[in-house]
Structures are given as C-alpha cells and as structure tokens.
C-alpha cells in the first residue's frame, strides 16, 4: 500500500486546523499510520528542505518550519500521494482551487499551512527522515472493506 508524508506547518497548528485537515484525509478513506507533534530542529529542517539549499528562500523556509510546532504524519492508501496533493492544492493558496486545504484556508505562499510529498521516492525519504519505523503502526480499519474492492 502506498504511503505519503504530510506535515501541518506551524501556521496550520497555530490556527487550529489540525483536526480539520486530518478529517479531510480520513474522510477520503486514507489511513493514518503515524502522527506526532514536533518542534522541528534546525538540522531536521535543513535536511527536509535540502533540495532548496541553493535557492534564495531556503533560509526563510527553515526559519518558518522551526518557528512553532509541526504535526508530522504518515498516511497510507491506494494512490494516496496524488490524492493528498490534489486535496492540499497548489503551493500558492491564491491559485489553489476552492475545496482544497490551501484554497479554503490559505492566503500567503509563505504561510501555506501544509506539506505533502510529491512522489514515491520523496515520500520514502521524508518518512525515513521524520519517523523511525517503530513509530509507524500497522493496523486494519474496519471500514477498509467498504473502501477498497
């Protein structure tokens, strides 16, 4: 089963959107297998955003993600990476469609509430970076037979 990493950034936590965001993913039928509230270290932030290290906005990304608590999550399900990206919406909330998390709750590209892995390899790297395998729970929701054939 496919897995993805999703993080509710400090602005989403401070604005009280954690429950709303989790509910949207659960309502789609995706399964939460890992969750923790983290005060992100400088080291973790720099590793997470390593691909942007040479970009002019790298330091502002690191500063923001370390500015408050982050809810780190691992979700699993059929096509979860693409579906979660669609549910999250475009990076710039002003361009995100209504009905997406960023379209409904975001205003500023620098405060866009949530991060989601953009592909299988990225998801694997981010999950390994943020979670130890022992922190991920293998379980079967009773509703699973009503969601998947």
Curated annotation (Swiss-Prot):
Pathway where this protein functions: Purine metabolism
In terms of PROSITE patterns, this protein maps to: NDPK, NDPK_LIKE
Q: Which terms in the GO cellular component ontology are assigned? A: cytoplasm
Catalytic function, reaction form: dZDP + ATP = dZTP + ADP; a 2'-deoxyribonucleoside 5'-diphosphate + ATP = a 2'-deoxyribonucleoside 5'-triphosphate + ADP; a ribonucleoside 5'-diphosphate + ATP = a ribonucleoside 5'-triphosphate + ADP
Domain of life of the native organism: Bacteria
Task: Name the gene.
Answer: ndk
The residues listed in the UniProt record as binding ATP, with positions renumbered to this chain, are 9, 57, 85, 91, 102, 112
Q: What are the UniProt keywords, alphabetically?
A: ATP-binding, Cytoplasm, Kinase, Magnesium, Metal-binding, Nucleotide metabolism, Nucleotide-binding, Phosphoprotein, Transferase
Location in or out of the cell:
Cytoplasm
Q: What is its main location?
A: cytoplasm
Q: Name one GO molecular function term.
A: metal ion binding
Similarity comment text for this entry: Belongs to the NDK family.
What protein name does the entry list? Nucleoside diphosphate kinase
State how it assembles. Homotetramer.
* Family matches, as SMART domains: NDK (SM00562)
Per its UniProt entry, what is the enzyme's top EC class, as one word? transferase
Q: Which cofactor does it need?
A: Mg(2+)
NCBIfam families this protein is in? PRK00668.1 (NF001908)
Give the Enzyme Commission number.
Answer: 2.7.4.6
